[in-house]
């Protein structure tokens, strides 16, 4: 009799977690393992597109704080911690999706136009394609994330591009590193 009570208690303890662990509305969850693989590939591509070259302090321009504030960051309130992912992973996945859209627009902008690494199958082109692939994995057919309007980058001057490219790629490296950790945890603990 004690064995059946223990089994019942175990089922009751596990049931709320599986019932609440929903990634997107409608009860579907992302393919955590596929997201993990693509996010790891994104990390590798981000580092190959812009390898580390030591610490460089670039002078801040006026309005630079504004552009820094526009860059998506995964923060505590996004629910990307293990408990937040278990209870409701949608806010976290929506934040990651928002960041992927942001960086996809930047990589497709004139900031990277003419860059040798943008040639077909170059590092930035592969990075752009992988961002698109992960974004599509996170957004199931027929479902549109409610994200803030992400403005397209304004046209840049050639001299600005040389400063913006490494800054964007460093920011992307940090973003995809956190996203990869989220997907690794999801693949390890939330996959049915």
UniProtKB/Swiss-Prot annotation:
Localization of this protein: Secreted
Keyword presence, Mitochondrion: no
InterPro entries per UniProt: 4_helix_cytokine-like_core (IPR009079), IL-23_alpha (IPR010831)
GO cellular component: interleukin-23 complex
Annotated signal peptide: 1-21
Annotated GO biological process: defense response to virus; inflammatory response; innate immune response; positive regulation of defense response to virus by host; positive regulation of T cell proliferation; positive regulation of T-helper 1 type immune response; positive regulation of T-helper 17 cell lineage commitment; tissue remodeling
UniProt keyword list: Antiviral defense, Cytokine, Disulfide bond, Immunity, Inflammatory response, Innate immunity, Secreted, Signal, Tissue remodeling
Membrane in keyword set: no
PANTHER family found in the cross-reference section: INTERLEUKIN-23 SUBUNIT ALPHA, SGRF
Subunit structure: Heterodimer with IL12B; disulfide-linked. The heterodimer is known as interleukin IL-23. Interacts with IL23R; this interaction enables recruitment of IL12RB1.
Protein name, UniProt field: Interleukin-23 subunit alpha
Gene source species: Equus caballus
